[in-house]
């Protein structure tokens, strides 16, 4: 009958266990024994290198037929072996055989005994023939080489461009008496004509002050400062960015002259030349400037090398291509040494210029991502797998190569791949390997293009060369050339690359684990199959020695078996409870001196209350119904027999004591399965596109656009200068224009006149400003009040002088004369009665002469101013007057001098 998988799985274990036990018995029997020397246990320990333990002493045997022996105290643990000299002292304290058996049964309650009747041949079995084992999995077709991995180029094409435009600002201002107000500001940008760019800006570094442009289909012209057209010098911008420079013609906005209560207009034309960065992305049909302005024309458009087929959205007269163009640095005025082909395009808002270059090889849709020094290529089914431990990645491709002609704008792939491969080969493989053929290109999943250069070691190369020469000798001399490749007419395409490499890394991990597990399981399957075939031979031989054990291990339960030729007859064994089995304490045959049983005798019952059956203990807890296992008695007899869950020890054919399985050293028959554990592998960070590449992939750099727009006023305008409204500006402008028209003499006179007028205006303006100040008005008011007070007192003094000159001129003298306490005055008055007429006349004469002296001094002073003749006349008059004064005037003695001095 067929057996299940668990039974077949335990066969090899049982066979090796039997062989191990047989080896142990042979070693024990071959070891020399003497009285007092241990038996099997000693042999086992000696074989293991340990010290020999003395055998325990023989115990007194209990009566054979007594099923219920006298109960003594039960020890908790098995009694350890004791020296032979202590047998007489410890014999009384040992437990009987049945008590020890009960202890064994209590410790191993799951140990059962079996009664196996002899097979009759009703059921026969045979062993399976050896199986054919699977072959060892062969390795894949691995090829080592160098690889360069390309990814989609998401970076835009960048180039330098120059913008030419004129900022036109028209401001409307209303001027009041004390303030001005903007009523409107119109701002626009006008392109610079081609002729002005070439003949004025690039040739001389100047720009016209007018801007002529079209708005609403009407051509209009703006004049800077509302004046005639002139050439204005271009000067560098105030603040330059990191990536561009700029030049312009004016800093300040022009405001109209002040005329109160009128609306005035002023025009400013600022010519600006600005270097900017330009960007264009695939398919390069347009480009955008750093200012945010779009140009709907391919940067590769032109009239050379078929570039006129590129995209453009402008009319032909708006574009111009100049060959042999020498650019000029507007800061240093230096001219470029090498000519270029210059493209110029005018738009409604600006004119842009850039250097023309051919489209190939200026741009490439693929870019190099990784250079891999060691790349293994293996074939799995219908695909190639490229694996590299350096980047922990596996790429899956088709078996066919990918033609580079299908890659749109892929001229850089072959050159970059060859350069990188040559550099790696020269550095690492030049002395050990050779290149096999030309680089091969494969398109991997995810949009990665792999350039692969197979390598071959020098040793293998010699073998392949010899084989190749043999193959070439067998080929026909003129082979048919292959048909032209279909890729010549294949349509081009752009390869799209994913932004994540995680799928390739997962593929690498899966391949790594799959390769390891498959190899390990393959080795296990082969070893298992070969082991089963080897064990089958042992099973066939072992069944002849012990068919019961072989049959039980094969069937999976306890059976009895015997060989019937080449087949084995089996019968089922009957289980017997451990409590119903009793072992006898002696193995000697009383009726036959010198003969002993080779196995212990037992008594058992099939059921608890059944009759007692006599038998013999077989191997592996088998209860034999016969007692025919006999052998001659020997001196130094020591045996261990399996009994339930432990062992019973017989010495000199008599029971000694019991042992548990843990007391016996175990010799393992298992074969260790050598399985290589999965090695550790660390993943390195890997990015397809860096943060900078993703940020730079767009057509517009919004950060740069915002920066430039916010810096525009700072670069091309003076934001710190403040122009105040001036009411006299119109008058000065008119005077200046009047004198300018009179030539050089008029300009000289105009400067003098305008200087005088400016001084007067400044003085008046200063006074007006001082009066408009609150503190100034207060000071003027105080000065006016002080002046009025001074005028009042002066007027009063003059009136007093006219009414009473003496009192006004000599107030103290007059006061003394009127004082009645003066004795001189009172006495003289009383004596004379009135004033002295002579003195009064003299006083009048003195006053008259004083007036005459004053008149003479004035005459002399005027004569000095007029000249010599007047001075002589004044001298003559003075002499005449002196002559008269000497004749008529006589000095009056001063009689009252002392009195006057006392009064004073």
Swiss-Prot record:
<feature type="glycosylation site" description="N-linked (GlcNAc...) asparagine; by host">
    <location>
        <position position="674"/>
    </location>
</feature>
<dbReference type="GO" id="GO:0019062">
    <property type="term" value="P:virion attachment to host cell"/>
</dbReference>
<feature type="region of interest" description="Involved in fusion and/or binding to host membrane">
    <location>
        <begin position="173"/>
        <end position="179"/>
    </location>
</feature>
<feature type="disulfide bond">
    <location>
        <begin position="364"/>
        <end position="412"/>
    </location>
</feature>
<keyword id="KW-1160">Virus entry into host cell</keyword>
<keyword id="KW-0261">Viral envelope protein</keyword>
<feature type="region of interest" description="Hydrophobic membrane proximal region">
    <location>
        <begin position="719"/>
        <end position="772"/>
    </location>
</feature>
<dbReference type="InterPro" id="IPR035377">
    <property type="entry name" value="Glycoprot_B_PH1"/>
</dbReference>
<dbReference type="GO" id="GO:0044175">
    <property type="term" value="C:host cell endosome membrane"/>
</dbReference>
<protein>
    <recommendedName>
        <fullName>Envelope glycoprotein B</fullName>
    </recommendedName>
</protein>
<feature type="disulfide bond">
    <location>
        <begin position="596"/>
        <end position="633"/>
    </location>
</feature>
<dbReference type="InterPro" id="IPR035381">
    <property type="entry name" value="Glycoprot_B_PH2"/>
</dbReference>
<keyword id="KW-0732">Signal</keyword>
<keyword id="KW-0472">Membrane</keyword>
<dbReference type="GO" id="GO:0046718">
    <property type="term" value="P:symbiont entry into host cell"/>
</dbReference>
<feature type="topological domain" description="Intravirion">
    <location>
        <begin position="796"/>
        <end position="904"/>
    </location>
</feature>
<keyword id="KW-0946">Virion</keyword>
<feature type="short sequence motif" description="Internalization motif">
    <location>
        <begin position="889"/>
        <end position="892"/>
    </location>
</feature>
<feature type="compositionally biased region" description="Low complexity">
    <location>
        <begin position="31"/>
        <end position="65"/>
    </location>
</feature>
<dbReference type="Pfam" id="PF17417">
    <property type="entry name" value="Glycoprot_B_PH2"/>
</dbReference>
<feature type="glycosylation site" description="N-linked (GlcNAc...) asparagine; by host">
    <location>
        <position position="398"/>
    </location>
</feature>
<dbReference type="Pfam" id="PF00606">
    <property type="entry name" value="Glycoprotein_B"/>
</dbReference>
<feature type="signal peptide">
    <location>
        <begin position="1"/>
        <end position="30"/>
    </location>
</feature>
<feature type="compositionally biased region" description="Pro residues">
    <location>
        <begin position="476"/>
        <end position="485"/>
    </location>
</feature>
<feature type="region of interest" description="Disordered">
    <location>
        <begin position="883"/>
        <end position="904"/>
    </location>
</feature>
<feature type="disulfide bond">
    <location>
        <begin position="116"/>
        <end position="573"/>
    </location>
</feature>
<feature type="disulfide bond">
    <location>
        <begin position="133"/>
        <end position="529"/>
    </location>
</feature>
<keyword id="KW-1040">Host Golgi apparatus</keyword>
<dbReference type="Pfam" id="PF17416">
    <property type="entry name" value="Glycoprot_B_PH1"/>
</dbReference>
<feature type="disulfide bond">
    <location>
        <begin position="207"/>
        <end position="271"/>
    </location>
</feature>
<keyword id="KW-0812">Transmembrane</keyword>
<keyword id="KW-1032">Host cell membrane</keyword>
<feature type="transmembrane region" description="Helical">
    <location>
        <begin position="775"/>
        <end position="795"/>
    </location>
</feature>
<dbReference type="InterPro" id="IPR055341">
    <property type="entry name" value="Glycoprotein_B_ecto_C"/>
</dbReference>
<feature type="topological domain" description="Virion surface">
    <location>
        <begin position="31"/>
        <end position="774"/>
    </location>
</feature>
<keyword id="KW-1161">Viral attachment to host cell</keyword>
<dbReference type="InterPro" id="IPR000234">
    <property type="entry name" value="Herpes_Glycoprot_B"/>
</dbReference>
<dbReference type="InterPro" id="IPR038631">
    <property type="entry name" value="Glycoprot_B_PH2_sf"/>
</dbReference>
<keyword id="KW-1039">Host endosome</keyword>
<feature type="glycosylation site" description="N-linked (GlcNAc...) asparagine; by host">
    <location>
        <position position="489"/>
    </location>
</feature>
<feature type="glycosylation site" description="N-linked (GlcNAc...) asparagine; by host">
    <location>
        <position position="87"/>
    </location>
</feature>
<comment type="subunit">
    <text>Homotrimer; disulfide-linked. Interacts with host receptor MYH9/NMMHC-IIA. Interacts with host receptor MYH10/NMMHC-IIB. Binds to heparan sulfate proteoglycans. Interacts with gH/gL heterodimer.</text>
</comment>
């Amino acid at each position: 009958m067929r057996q299940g998988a668990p039974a077949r799985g335990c066969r090899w274990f049982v066979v090796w266990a039997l062989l191990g036990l047989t080896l142990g018995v042979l070693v024990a029997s071959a070891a020399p024994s003497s009285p007092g020397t241990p038996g099997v246990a000693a042999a086992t320990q000696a074989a293991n290198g340990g010290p020999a333990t003395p055998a325990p002493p023989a115990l007194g045997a209990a009566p054979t037929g007594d099923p219920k022996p006298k109960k003594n105290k039960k020890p908790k643990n098995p009694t350890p072996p004791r020296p032979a000299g202590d047998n007489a002292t410890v014999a009384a304290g040992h437990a009987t055989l049945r008590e020890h058996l009960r202890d064994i049964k209590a410790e191993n309650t799951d140990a059962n005994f079996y009664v196996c009747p002899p097979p009759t041949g009703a059921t026969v079995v045979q062993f399976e023939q050896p199986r054919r084992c699977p072959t060892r999995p062969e390795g894949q077709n691995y090829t080592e080489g160098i690889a360069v991995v390309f990814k989609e180029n998401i970076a835009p094409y960048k180039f330098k461009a120059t913008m030419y435009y004129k900022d036109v600002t028209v401001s409307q201002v209303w001027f009041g008496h004390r303030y001005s107000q903007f009523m409107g500001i119109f701002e626009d940008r006008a392109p610079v004509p081609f002729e002005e760019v070439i003949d004025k800006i690039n040739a001389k570094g100047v720009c016209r002050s007018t801007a002529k442009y079209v708005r609403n289909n009407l051509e209009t012209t703006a004049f800077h400062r509302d004046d005639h057209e002139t050439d204005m010098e271009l000067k560098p911008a105030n603040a330059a960015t990191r990536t561009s420079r700029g030049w312009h013609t004016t800093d300040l906005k022009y405001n109209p002259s002040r005329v109160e209560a009128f609306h005035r207009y002023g025009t400013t034309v600022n010519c600006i030349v600005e270097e900017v960065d330009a960007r264009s992305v695939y398919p390069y049909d347009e480009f955008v400037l750093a200012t945010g302005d779009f140009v709907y024309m391919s940067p590769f458009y032109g009239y050379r090398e078929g570039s006129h087929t590129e995209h453009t959205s402008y009319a032909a007269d708006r574009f111009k291509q100049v060959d042999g163009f020498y650019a000029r640095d507007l800061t240093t005025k230096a001219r470029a040494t090498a000519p270029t082909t210059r493209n110029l395009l005018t738009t409604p808002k600006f004119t842009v210029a850039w250097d023309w270059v051919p489209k190939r090889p200026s741009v490439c849709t693929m870019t190099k991502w990784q250079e891999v020094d060691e790349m293994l290529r293996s074939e799995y089914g219908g695909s190639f797998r490229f694996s590299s431990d350096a980047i922990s990645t596996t790429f899956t491709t088709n078996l066919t190569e990918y033609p580079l002609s299908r890659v749109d704008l892929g001229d850089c792939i072959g050159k970059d791949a060859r350069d990188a491969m040559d550099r790696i080969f020269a550095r690492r493989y030049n002395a050990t390997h050779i290149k096999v053929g030309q680089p091969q290109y494969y398109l991997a999943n995810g949009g990665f293009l792999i350039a692969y250069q197979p390598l071959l070691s020098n040793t293998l190369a010699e073998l392949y060369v010899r084989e190749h020469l043999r193959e070439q000798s067998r080929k026909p001399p003129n082979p048919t050339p292959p048909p032209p490749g279909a890729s010549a007419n294949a349509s081009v395409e752009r390869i799209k690359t994913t932004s994540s490499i995680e799928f390739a890394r997962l593929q690498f991990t899966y391949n790594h684990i799959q390769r390891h597990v498959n190899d390990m399981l393959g080795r296990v399957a082969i070893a298992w199959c070969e082991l089963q075939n080897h064990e089958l031979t042992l099973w066939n031989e072992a069944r002849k020695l012990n068919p019961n054990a072989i049959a039980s291990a094969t069937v999976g339960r306890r059976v009895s078996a015997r060989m019937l030729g080449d087949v084995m007859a089996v019968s089922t064994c009957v289980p017997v409870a451990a409590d119903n089995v009793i072992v006898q304490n002696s193995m000697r045959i009383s009726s036959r001196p010198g003969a002993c049983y080779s196995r212990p005798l037992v008594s058992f019952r099939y059921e608890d209350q059944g009759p007692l059956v006599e038998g013999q203990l077989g191997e592996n807890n088998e209860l034999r119904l016969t007692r025919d296992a006999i052998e001659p008695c020997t001196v130094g007899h020591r045996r261990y027999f399996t009994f339930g869950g432990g062992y019973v020890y017989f010495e000199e054919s008599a029971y000694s004591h019991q042992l548990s399985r843990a007391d016996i050293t175990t010799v393992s028959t298992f074969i260790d399965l050598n399985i290589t554990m999965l090695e550790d592998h660390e993943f390195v960070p890997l990015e397809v596109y860096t943060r900078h590449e993703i940020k730079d992939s767009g057509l517009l750099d919004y950060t740069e656009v915002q920066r430039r727009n916010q810096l525009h006023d700072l670069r091309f305008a003076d934001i710190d200068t403040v122009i105040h409204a001036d009411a006299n500006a119109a008058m000065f402008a008119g005077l200046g224009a009047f004198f300018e028209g009179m030539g050089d003499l008029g300009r000289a006179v105009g400067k003098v006149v305008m200087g005088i007028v400016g001084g007067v205006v400044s003085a008046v303006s200063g006074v007006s400003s001082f009066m408009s100040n609150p503190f100034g008005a207060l000071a003027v008011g105080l000065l006016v009040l002080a002046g009025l007070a001074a005028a009042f007192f002066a007027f009063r003094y003059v009136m007093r002088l006219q009414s009473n000159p003496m009192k006004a001129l000599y107030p103290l003298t007059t006061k003394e004369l009127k004082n009645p306490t003066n004795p001189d005055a009172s006495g003289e008055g009383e004596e004379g009665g009135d004033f002295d007429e002579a003195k009064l006349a003299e006083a009048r004469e003195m006053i008259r002469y004083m007036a005459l002296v004053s008149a003479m001094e004035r005459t002399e002073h005027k004569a000095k101013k007029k000249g010599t003749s007047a001075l002589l006349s004044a001298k003559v008059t003075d002499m005449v007057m002196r002559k008269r004064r000497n004749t008529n005037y006589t000095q009056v003695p001063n009689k009252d001098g002392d009195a006057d001095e006392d009064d004073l």
